[in-house]
Amino acid sequence: MTRETTAAAAESTIRSLEDQRYAAVIAGDVDGFLALAHPDLVYTHSNAEVDTLDSYVDKLRSGHYVYHHIDHPVSRVLIAGHTAVVVGEMHADLTAGGVRKKLANRALAVWVRDRDRWLLLAYQPTVIPGDDR
């Protein structure tokens, strides 16, 4: 395989994993999300709150976060060695702490290759200002 072929295959895999992780949280499939997440996950929210894997999963299990719908267009996937950076957006309809919300964020997700599989290591959304939505 050429370097370009390998990078294209990795990009395709990462795009699929992004679809799977969003589908898991929409479905309330915590085990499905856990299968995709690195144990050292840093999950930052658009309100600047930061969760670890354990605290985020606890919030999913308790119903603190209930995702009703998510669109997540991907602009770019950058592959550098065993790291993939996903640049895109996340538009969501969710309930957080009992309050229904709509989110419009630019988003950055970091995946790392660990023992022949890709795992989500970090997620960072940034609110898109109202005029730019």
Identify the function of each model-found stretch.
Residues M1-A35, D40-R133:
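A beta-strand edge to alpha-helix "cap/lid" segment located at domain peripheries
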